[in-house]
Regions:
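Short, conserved beta-strand element in jelly-roll/cupin
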Residues: 31, 36-40, 49-68, 104-107
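Short acidic-glycine-tyrosine-enriched beta hairpin
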Residues: 70-85
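A short, N-terminal "cap"/entry segment at the start of jelly-roll beta-barrel domains
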Residues: 1-32, 46, 114-147
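Short glycine-/acidic-enriched loop or helix-start segments at secondary-structure transitions
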Residues: 68-69, 77, 92-93, 112-114
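Short histidine-centered beta-strand/loop micro-motifs
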Residues: 24-27, 36, 45-51, 92-94
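A short hydrophobic beta-strand segment most commonly corresponding to one strand
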Residues: 82, 96-115
Length: 147
């Protein structure tokens, strides 16, 4: 199924307000996720992990910065990082230019996060620590911006 740039719906992420677009939301894919993330200067996405999903992070524009566990990585344009399910990870941007990431993950794991109707999703499974904490490289930065 062809997906064109016109098919993408860009929106801010829930917690960190990072612009992102889901390539596969209209395809019905049950096993794969693929999303673009455009990190503005001096921003970060959530610190999180997964239950069984591996993710491949690929930099399309700019120079990517990422923490995986205790390690901080610098990822050049057209470079990538494979992250296992149980590793804490966070992409961030400590530069003055936007950074565009393509993040592909499999298998999809939404069913593992679904709790009962009364309790909802168990977010501690993917956010074992404070998800909105910023990396030390962004000390003194206010992100997400106050509305």
């Amino acid at each position: 199924q062809l997906i064109t740039p016109d098919d993408l719906h860009w929106r801010p992420s829930n917690l960190m307000k990072i612009p992102n677009a889901d390539f596969l939301e209209r395809t019905g894919s049950e096993n794969l996720s693929a999303r673009l993330w455009r990190l503005p200067p001096k921003s970060a996405n959530t610190l999180h992990k997964h239950i069984r999903q591996e993710e491949f992070y690929f930099v399309l524009e700019g120079t990517g910065r990422m923490r995986v566990g205790e390690e901080t990585l610098t990822v050049p344009k057209h470079g990538g990082v494979l992250v296992g399910p149980d590793q804490l990870r966070q992409v961030f941007n400590d530069t003055e230019a936007d950074v565009l990431w393509l993040v592909v993950g499999a298998p999809e794991e939404l069913e593992f996060l679904q709790g009962s109707k009364s309790t909802g999703m168990d977010l501690k499974l993917i956010y074992p620590t404070e998800p909105t904490q910023l990396p030390k490289e962004l000390d003194g930065v206010q992100w997400p911006p106050k509305a």
